[in-house]
Amino acid sequence: MKTQDVKMYATQQLHRLQALPDNQRRAELAKLRRGIGHAPGELPELWGSFLLEMPESFQGRSAPSAAEWAVYLALTLYAVHQQGNDRPMNCPGNTLGRAVRQLAERNSAGQDWTEASVLRRFNALATAEEITEISHHLRGMIQLLSAAKDGGIPLDYPQLAADLYELQCTDPRYAQTPANVRLRWGQDLYRDPKPALDEKEKEN
């Protein structure tokens, strides 16, 4: 599988976006937002935004490949997420499960975060199978993260691209891969967000 290559390419494209002058970056992000709800390649104005320097092995023949879908969704959703937020909404290490946990805790106002309504949305996303259905649920989740109380909650977009690529896996040799992605989401959601005690504290 090309998981790490997809993640690396998404990282490169995000760095390219972030390095643009302000006016040019805003224009590029606005263009990417217009791609929401469309399939990769459907809008010619976006070809360069996600196909620039894309490895030939990523490219589909008769339809968008899993890699093209993954990169396209990561970039267009990042553009939605960044809108209205001054600080970068791409944050390495803040996976989807962790970001949803942060959102649930903020929305629970001191109550049990596991009862937060956002978790029902997350469950709908996690059980979606078709990439278009995944895209629909993910868009709603990104909008919630963007509009979170006390400022938007960022997300690791290269990792999201990798997850989206693996969710589309149909190779029987890697039949467990989509389930493993969902398991990681659940693990990150329920993992204790507090830093572990260091060895000295444990000894005391």
Language-model features: locations:
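Alpha-helical oligomerization segments
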Residues: 150-204
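Short, flexible helical or helix-coil boundary motifs
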Residues: 17, 21, 36-39, 82, ...
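Short, extreme N-terminal leader segments that mark the start of a protein/domain
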Residues: 1-23
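A general alpha-helix detector
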Residues: 12-13, 28-31, 121, 140
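Conserved binding-pocket/active-site segment within a compact domain
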Residues: 89, 94-167
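Aromatic- and glycine-enriched beta-alpha-beta binding-site module
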Residues: 56-106
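N-terminal interaction modules that seed assembly of large macromolecular complexes
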Residues: 15-78
